[in-house]
Curated annotation (Swiss-Prot):
Binds 1 zinc ion per subunit. One of its GO terms (molecular function) is tRNA binding. The keyword Metal-binding applies. Disulfide bonds: none annotated. Belongs to the class-II aminoacyl-tRNA synthetase family. Zn(2+) binds at residues 588, 592, 691, 695. It comes from Mycobacterium leprae (strain TN). This is Alanine--tRNA ligase. The gene is alaS. GO terms for cellular component: cytosol. PANTHER family: ALANINE--TRNA LIGASE, CYTOPLASMIC (PTHR11777:SF9), ALANYL-TRNA SYNTHETASE (PTHR11777).
Length: 908
C-alpha cells in the first residue's frame, strides 16, 4: 500500500466518524520555546489548555513534524528520523479512552475492502501506563487482547508530554509484531525492533510544569476537560504495510537512496550491514536529511548560524559531507531536492510549486559549504596527524576552536570527523574557548558603548534594585540622584566647571531612582531630554545624550553638563524631549506595522532577526532567502500604509507569557522572557507582539511610511529600511521635486519620464556601439598604415612612432601586437608612444612588441620599455614578446623613440 493511500484511508476513516479534517500546520510556530512542531497536537494546544473554544469537537490531521535531538543517531539506527508525518485524531472534551481505542483498533484491523489497513489482530500488542487499569480493561473488552499482550510501563514510556510546560497524560501504545526474524519474543518491553510501535493514544487529562527529563516534572493539575490526542507515524505504518525492513525502504525514502546509488561508486547494501555499515549510514543520512531540509526550506527557514536556520544548515552540511565520503565529488543537492519534492509533492504540493526557491537555497548552501570543506579539511587532517603522532586520542579544544573560528567548521562536524578517525574531541576545552570569545565580544561591545567604563563601579546601585521607568505614563518625572559617575568613577558631586579642566573629557553619567527617559533596548534608541535641579539647585541643567541599561535594570543617563552642579541625593526633574519621543514612537510602531505587513505578504516565516528605530526612521532585519521582487516591495509598502490609514488603536497590556503566546503574540526566537510580559496590540489580530518599547496611541500617528530599499546583510537575512512621519513626507517631496526637474529637462509629463529615459538609454547604447566600431576601424587603419611605413635598422624591421591624437593604453597594446603580426617572420620590433591629453595631467602610454626572430637576436620588449621609462619619467613591465608602461613627461617622447632605435641598432 503506497503512502498516499495510507494517508487517505486514515483521514477518510476519521472523517466518516464525524471528525473535521484539519490541514497540517507549518513546522514553524510563533513560539520561542518550541524549535519545531514535533507532534501532531501542537496546533491544538490552546484547545487542550482551555484557552479558547475549538470550532469542532473532534478533528483529524496529518501533521508535518521535525525532531532533531537524535540527529546524530539518524542512519546509525533505522528507527530515527528527523522528519516524519504524524497522523492523528483528536477529541476536545468529546470521546475519551473507549472511543480512542475503538477507532484505532477498527482502522488497523478492518479489511482493505472496509477501508482499513487489514493488519492481523494476533500480531498487535498494547502498552498502558502503570496504574491505568481502565485502559487495560478496554483493550481486553474491545480488541480481545489477552492480558499477556498488554504490558505496563512507567512515566518515561507511557506518560506523554511535548517536553515543555503544557498538556500531558497517560498513554497507550500499539505495537506490531514483525516476527521472529527481528528478535526474541516477549513484547515491546523486551525488543522494540521486533515489536514496532505504530500508534500512540494519549489520554490528555493533566497540565505539566517545568522539568528536565521525561519523568522529572510537576503535574500542575487536571485540564478543564478530558481530551484525546493520538499519533500514528505514517512512515512506521508504511514500513509494516509495504513489507520492508525499515523506513528507508518505503516509497518516500527509497527514491533518494536509489538516486545516490547512481552517483556513488559504492552501493547501498543493507543485506550486509556488518561489512557495509559506514556507507549504509551515509546513504540513510542523505535520504533522511534531504526530506527534512526540503520541508524546512519550504516552510520558510533559511540556513543561518543560529536557531532553526542552524539546524537546517547542519542537516545540509551532513548531506554534503556524507555524499563526499561516499565518493561523490560533483554537486548533488539539487538532484536530491528534485527527488524529494517529486516523492512528497502529492502530499505537500507546495514542494512542487515552490521548488525553484527550495532548490536555489539548498544549492547555494552546498556551494558555500564545499568552499568551507576545501579550506578546512587540510587543517583537520594536519590536526589528526599531529594528535596521533603525539600519542593522544583527543583532539585539543584549541584545534577544534580554530577550525570553528577560522574555517567555519561547526563543532558537530569536527566531532563527527574525529570519530571517523578514531578520536574524540576536548569538548569542554572547546566550549571554554567559545565562552571566552563570547565574553570578549560582550566586553568589547560594552566597552564601545560605555567608553571603557569599569562596570563594577555600578555594582552597589545594581544590587539596590532597578530604576523605576515612568516613561509609559509621563514625560516629566521628579527623581532623586542615586549616583554620579565621571570617567567611570563614582563621585559625590559634579559641576559644570569640569568641562574646562585639563584631562577631563566631560563624560558624566547620572543614575536616578526614577526616570521617564527610555534606555536603548529592543531596537529603539534612547530618549533625548534634560535633567534639571529644583529649588536651590534650579540653576543646574544637563542635556541627556544617551541612556543605557546596566545589568538590564539600571538606567544610566549620559549627559553634557550645561550649568550648575549636581550632588548625590539631590532631587531633580528628568524631562523627555517630546518631539524626540514622538519620532521614536513613530519609528517603533512603524516597525511593528512593517513586520506585520511582511508576514502578510511573504508568510509567517519572515521571522524578525533584528531592528533599529529612531525618530523618523526604521530598519527591520528578517530571515528570508533571496531578494524581494518589486511587486513584493510594493505590496509590503501598501499593506503598511493601509494599516496606518486604518487608524488602528494601539493597546498595551501585561500578560502571563504562556497566555500571551496562546493569544498569538509574536516573540523573538531564542529571547528569554519573564513570566509577565508587555504586549503591544495594533488593530486586533493585525499586529500582536511582545515589546517593551514606546509607541503611538493609534497607527494614524505614525504618518506615511516610505520603504527606501531592501538588501542582504548576510546569508539568509534581509534588511528593509524606511522613513516614517515627517521624514517620509520630506523624502517624498524631494523625490517629487526630482521627478519634476527630470520631466522639465526631458520635456515630457512626469508619467512619461521612465519611458523617455529608457529610450534615451537605448539610443546612448547604440551610439556607444557605433563609436566603438569607429574606434576599432581607426585602430585597424592605424596599424595598417604603421606597418606599411616600417623601416629597417640593420637586419630588423622596425616601427617606432609617436601616435597622433590621444589613444588608450589598451588600444596601444593591441596595436603593437597587430603591427608585429603584419611584419612577417623577419626580426621585427614595434614601439609606439602616445599622449592621452594636453596639459599638466597628460600621461604618456607606450608599448613594445618583439617577435621570436627579434628575441633570438637578444631584443626583449621589456628591456626596451625600461629604456623608454627612464626618458619619460615612467615605469612599466612585461615579457620579452610584449611589454608596456606609462610616463609623466611628454617632452621626452622624441628622445625616448631615439633611445629605442639606438638600442635596436646595437643588436641589428
Amino acid at each position: 500500500m503506497q503512502t498516499h493511500e495510507i494517508r487517505k484511508r486514515f483521514l477518510d476513516h476519521f472523517v466518516k466518524a464525524g471528525h473535521t479534517e484539519v490541514p497540517s500546520a507549518s513546522v514553524i510556530l510563533d513560539d520561542p520555546n518550541l524549535l519545531f512542531v514535533n507532534a501532531g497536537m501542537v496546533q491544538f494546544v490552546p484547545f487542550f489548555l482551555g484557552q479558547c473554544t475549538p470550532p469542532y469537537a473532534t478533528a483529524t490531521s496529518i501533521q508535518k513534524c521535525i525532531r532533531t535531538p537524535d540527529i546524530d543517531d539518524v542512519g546509525i539506527t533505522t528507527r530515527h528520523n528527523t522528519f516524519f508525518q504524524m497522523a492523528g485524531n483528536f477529541s476536545f472534551g468529546d470521546y475519551f479512552k473507549r472511543g480512542a481505542i475503538e477507532l484505532a483498533w477498527a482502522l488497523l484491523t478492518n479489511s482493505f475492502a472496509d477501508g482499513g489497513y487489514g493488519l492481523d489482530p494476533e500480531r498487535l500488542w498494547a502498552t498502558v501506563y502503570l496504574d491505568d487499569d481502565e485502559a487495560a480493561g478496554l483493550w481486553q473488552e474491545i480488541a480481545g487482547l489477552p492480558p499477556e499482550r498488554i504490558q505496563r510501563r512507567g512515566m518515561a514510556d507511557n506518560y506523554w508530554s511535548m517536553g515543555i510546560p503544557g498538556p500531558c497524560g497517560p498513554s497507550s501504545e500499539i505495537y506490531y509484531d514483525r516476527g521472529p526474524e527481528f528478535g526474541p519474543e516477549g513484547g515491546p518491553i523486551v525488543n522494540e525492533d521486533r515489536y514496532l510501535e505504530v500508534w500512540n493514544l494519549v489520554f490528555m487529562q493533566n497540565e505539566r510544569g517545568e522539568g528536565t527529563t521525561k519523568e522529572d516534572y510537576e503535574i500542575r493539575g487536571p485540564l478543564p476537560r478530558k481530551n484525546i490526542d493520538t499519533g500514528m507515524g505514517v512512515e512506521r505504518i508504511a514500513l509494516v504495510l509495504q513489507g520492508v525492513h525499515n523506513v528507508y525502504e518505503i516509497d518516500l525514502l527509497r527514491p533518494v537512496i536509489d538516486l545516490v546509488a547512481t552517483r556513488a561508486p559504492r552501493p547501498y547494501d543493507p543485506e550486509n550491514e556488518d561489512t557495509n555499515h559506514a556507507d549504509n549510514v551515509r546513504y540513510r543520512i542523505i535520504a533522511d536529511h534531504s526530506r527534512t531540509a526540503a520541508i524546512l526550506i519550504g516552510d520558510g527557514v533559511s540556513p543561518v548560524n543560529d536557531g532553526r536556520g542552524y539546524v537546517l544548515r547542519r542537516l545540509l552540511r551532513r548531506i554534503i559531507r556524507s555524499a563526499k565520503l561516499l565518493g561523490i565529488d560533483s554537486p548533488i543537492v539539487g538532484d536530491l531536492m528534485a527527488t524529494v519534492c517529486n516523492a512528497m509533492g502529492r502530499a505537500y504540493p507546495g514542494l512542487v510549486t515552490d521548488f525553484d526557491r527550495i532548490n536555489r537555497i539548498a544549492v547555494a548552501e552546498e556551494t558555500a559549504f564545499n568552499r568551507t570543506l576545501t579550506s578546512g579539511s587540510k587543517l583537520f587532517d594536519d590536526v589528526v596527524g599531529a594528535t596521533v603522532a603525539s600519542g593522544s586520542t583527543v583532539v585539543a579544544g584549541l584545534d577544534a576552536f580554530t577550525l570553528h573560528d577560522t574555517y567555519g567548521f561547526p563543532i558537530e562536524l569536527t566531532l563527527e570527523m574525529a570519530a571517523e578517525a578514531g578520536l574524540t574531541v576536548d569538548e569542554k576545552g572547546f566550549h571554554e574557548l567559545m565562552l571566552q570569545q563570547r565574553q570578549r565580544a560582550k566586553v568589547d561591545a560594552a566597552a564601545r558603548k560605555q567608553a571603557h567604563v569599569d562596570l563594577t563601579a555600578y555594582r552597589e546601585l545594581v544590587d539596590a534594585g532597578p530604576t523605576e521607568f515612568t516613561g509609559f505614563d509621563e514625560l516629566t518625572t521628579e527623581a532623586r540622584i542615586l549616583g554620579i559617575f565621571v570617567e567611570g568613577k563614582r563621585v559625590p558631586v559634579v559641576a559644570h566647571a569640569v568641562r574646562g579642566q585639563a584631562g577631563i573629557t566631560n563624560r558624566v553619567e547620572l543614575v536616578l531612582d526614577r526616570t521617564p527617559l527610555y534606555a536603548e533596548s529592543g531596537g529603539q534608541i534612547a530618549d533625548a531630554g534634560t535633567i534639571s535641579g529644583i529649588g536651590a539647585g534650579a540653576s543646574s541643567r544637563a542635556a541627556v545624550t544617551d541612556v543605557q541599561k546596566i545589568a538590564k535594570t539600571l538606567h544610566v543617563h549620559r549627559v553634557n553638563l550645561e550649568s550648575g552642579e549636581f550632588v548625590e541625593g539631590d532631587t531633580v526633574v528628568a524631562v523627555v524631549d517630546p518631539g524626540w519621543r514622538r519620532g521614536a514612537a513613530q519609528g517603533h510602531s512603524g516597525t511593528h506595522i512593517v513586520h506585520a505587513a511582511l508576514r502578510q505578504v511573504l508568510g509567517p516565516n519572515a521571522v524578525q532577526a533584528g531592528s533599529l528605530n529612531r525618530p523618523g526612521y526604521l530598519r527591520f532585519d528578517f530571515n528570508w532567502q533571496g531578494s524581494l521582487t518589486g511587486e513584493q516591495r510594493t505590496q509590503i509598502e501598501e499593506v503598511t500604509n493601509e494599516a496606518v490609514q486604518a487608524d488602528f488603536e494601539v493597546h498595551t497590556f501585561t500578560e502571563k507569557l504562556d497566555t500571551a503566546k496562546a493569544m498569538g503574540a509574536i516573540a523573538l526566537f531564542g529571547e528569554a522572557y519573564p513570566d509577565e510580559v508587555r504586549v503591544v496590540e495594533m488593530g486586533g489580530p493585525f499586529s500582536l507582539e511582545l515589546c517593551g518599547g514606546t509607541h503611538v496611541h493609534n497607527t494614524a500617528q505614525i504618518g506615511p511610511v516610505t520603504i527606501l530599499g531592501e538588501s542582504s546583510i548576510g546569508s539568509g537575512v534581509r534588511r528593509v529600511e524606511a522613513y516614517v512621519g515627517l521624514d517620509s513626507f520630506r523624502h517624498l517631496a524631494k523625490e517629487r521635486a526630482l521627478m519634476a526637474g527630470l520631466a522639465s529637462s526631458l520635456q515630457v509629463p512626469s508619467e512619461e519620464v521612465h519611458a523617455r529615459v529608457a529610450t534615451l538609454v537605448e539610443r546612448l547604447k547604440a551610439a556607444e556601439k557605433e563609436l566603438e566600431r569607429a574606434r576599432q576601424a581607426n585602430v585597424q587603419a592605424a596599424a595598417t598604415k604603421a606597418a606599411a611605413g616600417a623601416e629597417w635598422i640593420g637586419n630588423v624591421r622596425v616601427v617606432v612612432q609617436r601616435m597622433s591624437g590621444p589613444i588608450a593604453p589598451d588600444d596601444l597594446r593591441f596595436l603593437v601586437g597587430d603591427i608585429r603580426g603584419k611584419l612577417g617572420s623577419d626580426p621585427a620590433v614595434v614601439a609606439l608612444i602616445a599622449v592621452t591629453s594636453d596639459g599638466p595631467t597628460a600621461t604618456v602610454p607606450y608599448a613594445v612588441a618583439a617577435n621570436p626572430a627579434a628575441q633570438d637576436l637578444g631584443i626583449r620588449a621589456n628591456d626596451l620599455v625600461e629604456q623608454l621609462a627612464m626618458v619619460v619619467d615612467g615605469r612599466g613591465g612585461g615579457k620579452a614578446d610584449l611589454a608596456q608602461g606609462s610616463g609623466k613627461d611628454p617632452t621626452g617622447i622624441d628622445a625616448a623613440l631615439d633611445t629605442v632605435r639606438a638600442q635596436i641598432a646595437q643588436v641589428g
